[in-house]
A protein has these predicted regions:
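Non-catalytic accessory segments flanking enzymatic or RNA/DNA-binding domains
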Residues: 1-127
C-alpha cells in the first residue's frame, strides 16, 4: 500500500494575486503537484506541508472529507471555471492555522514543511 498524506499548500492566482490555502489527500504528492499545476494554469502552488497520522494506516480520505464538511463556510470563492481541479478544497487565506489545529486534534503531525526545508549546501570549492 502506498504511503498516504494529507497535504496543505498556499495557492495564489497568477492574475489577481489573491491567495488561499488548499487542503487535500494524496498517496503520491509529486504526481498530485504535477496534476494541480497542469490542470489549474491560473494558479501557483507553494509551501507544501505533508501531514501523517501517528498510528492510522487507512482512513486519510475520510478525515480529509470530515474537515471539508466541518469548514465549508470558510471556503474561498474560487469557481470551477478558473480552477477545474480542487476548487472545493481551497479556504480563505489565514485559515491554515485552524486547519493545522484540526489535523493535530485528529492525531496528524507535520512530517514535511517546504517553507522551512533547506536543501543540503555543497561547498563551492573543496580543497
Amino acid at each position: 500500500m502506498a504511503e498516504q498524506f494529507i497535504y496543505m499548500c498556499n495557492v495564489r492566482n497568477k492574475h489577481t494575486k489573491e491567495s488561499s490555502v488548499k487542503l487535500g489527500y494524496t498517496s503520491n504528492i509529486l504526481q498530485r503537484i504535477k496534476q494541480l499545476e497542469k490542470s489549474n494554469i491560473h494558479y501557483e502552488y507553494s509551501d507544501f506541508r505533508l501531514f501523517k497520522h501517528e498510528s492510522k494506516i487507512i482512513g486519510y480520505l475520510f478525515d480529509e472529507q470530515r474537515i471539508h464538511v466541518r469548514n465549508r463556510k470558510y471556503l474561498a470563492g474560487i469557481s470551477r471555471d478558473s480552477m477545474p481541479v480542487g476548487y472545493t478544497e481551497c479556504y480563505e487565506w489565514g485559515y491554515q492555522y485552524d486547519l493545522v489545529n484540526q489535523l493535530t486534534y485528529l492525531g496528524y503531525t507535520c512530517v514535511y514543511d517546504e517553507s522551512t526545508y533547506k536543501p543540503p549546501q555543497t561547498p563551492m570549492f573543496q580543497w
